[in-house]
Amino acid sequence: MLSVQPKGKQKGCAGCNRKIKDRYLLKALDKYWHEDCLKCACCDCRLGEVGSTLYTKANLILCRRDYLRLFGTTGNCAACSKLIPAFEMVMRARDNVYHLDCFACQLCNQRFCVGDKFFLKNNMILCQTDYEEGLMKEGYAPQVR
């Protein structure tokens, strides 16, 4: 997205229609932009500062967050049933999606860390201790993930 402008012919900015005299310019959607002119249509953030990816839909140029907010899909957390915004990081277990804070054993509330084993029983996530206790009491065998 960021380019060094070669000496010689200056490019015109697609945002303000003025010549780009700066050493650096942005190229997006086959057009050239001043760094200050390529902004998200919703939040006005400078897209050159927030990453190398921009999103476009319905003639709007958007940052990732606003694109997902406007056009992304949302769902509900399998643990708390509250809405999960499309831009939020999540944890997944099979077809279930969880807020990061909700990804914990649903019996003892122990939060899982990277690499921890968890078990799925009747769409409930369980830690190894609660799974083994339940296995001994009830004889159930959820799947290890």
Curated annotation (Swiss-Prot):
LIM zinc-binding domain: residues covered: 11-73, 75-137
Induction data: By dopamine.
GO cellular component annotations of the record: nucleus
InterPro entries listed in its UniProt record: LMO_RBTN_TF, Znf_LIM
One of the record's GO molecular function terms: transcription coactivator activity
Record's keyword terms, sorted: LIM domain, Metal-binding, Repeat, Transcription, Transcription regulation, Zinc
UniProt-listed Pfam families: LIM (PF00412)
GO biological process terms, semicolon-separated: negative regulation of transcription by RNA polymerase II; positive regulation of transcription by RNA polymerase II; regulation of T cell homeostatic proliferation
PROSITE patterns xref list: LIM_DOMAIN_1, LIM_DOMAIN_2
PANTHER family referenced in this protein's UniProt entry, alphabetically: LD11652P (PTHR45787), RHOMBOTIN-1 (PTHR45787:SF2)
Protein name, UniProt field: LIM domain only protein 3
Source lineage: Eukaryota, Metazoa, Chordata, Craniata, Vertebrata
Gene label: Lmo3
